[in-house]
Structures are given as structure tokens and as C-alpha cells.
Amino acid sequence: MQKHWLVIAAVLAACCIGLVSAQTDAGTNETTNASITVTDQMVEGDAVVGNVTVDEVVSNGTGCIVIHNNLFGHPGGVIGYTPVESGTNRNVTVTIHTFVATDTLFAVLHHDAGKVGVFEYPIPDIEQKVEGEIVIVPFNVTAENATLLNLTSLCPGNST
């Protein structure tokens, strides 16, 4: 009978350890397997709005994939976002404002930590992190029906 209780205790302990390790640490927003896969692409749309496609988003919990323009090599303003489910999401279409889009964009994965289904930035829907790093991927875009900005070329003294 005592072996029976030891087995039950061991199984319960293993289950609890598994649940704890799979959770996000709310204090640091650390996740273990969050990721983004996105390839360079052409924006589908016109000079005002268009769509980009994120090949794959793996999110720990519900969240949003957010597209930022490029502000001198760093994420600038938010130009589009769409919700994602917990787990793997494939071929995620994000509608963006092409009139403020740059030729390099950043895809950033955010938690849905506030009102469910509403993107509340910058808080409480902060970026997901893995090993202390924000889950972010830059990608290049072109467009046939819109002029994309290149802010680096607009810098004073930059001849490119």
C-alpha cells in the first residue's frame, strides 16, 4: 500500500513540475519556446493599407504579432497587428498602414495580458522574451502599389 502512495506522489510531483516549467514567469515575461519565422516579401495592397504574412508564430499563451516600422535600425512605430493563439500559428496575415511602412519591418511577439483580444501597447501587452531577449525578427519588404520609406537614407550626411 505504501508503494502505491509513493507512485501517486511521484506522478503528482512530475505533473506539477511540468506545469510550472511550461508557464510564463509573469515577473519577467520569459517564455521557453516563443518564436517568429518571417521571410522577405512583397506587401499586398495599395498606398494606404496592405498585408504582410508571417510564416509562423509560436506563442506561449494568447498574444499579438505586431509589425513595427524601422526607425534607424530599431523598431519604430506600430503599423499593424493581429491576434495569435497559444501555440503554433501558421501563415498569419497582418494588415499594415503602408503609407508609414519602411522597407525593413520588425515582427514582434506580444503577450495578451490585459483585456482579452485588445492590443494594449505599451502596457500591459508587453513583448514576449526568450532567455532575456525580446522575440523580434526584422524582414525586408517591397511594394508595387506603394512607396516604402527608407529612413536611414533620409539621415543628414548619409549619401546612400
Please provide the spans of the model-predicted regions:
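Solvent-exposed serine/threonine-rich low-complexity stretches and specific carbohydrate-binding patches
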Residues: 77-87
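Secretory targeting signatures
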Residues: 1-28, 160
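A composition-driven surface/loop motif
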Residues: 51-53, 58, 119, 129-133
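Short, surface-exposed binding/anchoring microloops in extracellular/periplasmic proteins
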Residues: 30-76
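Short, aromatic- and glycine-rich surface loops/edge beta-strands on solvent-exposed regions
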Residues: 102-114
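Exposed aromatic-hydrophobic patches
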Residues: 53-54, 88-98
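Short acidic/polar inter-strand loop motif in beta-rich domains
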Residues: 111-124
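Transition segment at domain starts
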Residues: 23-48, 135-150
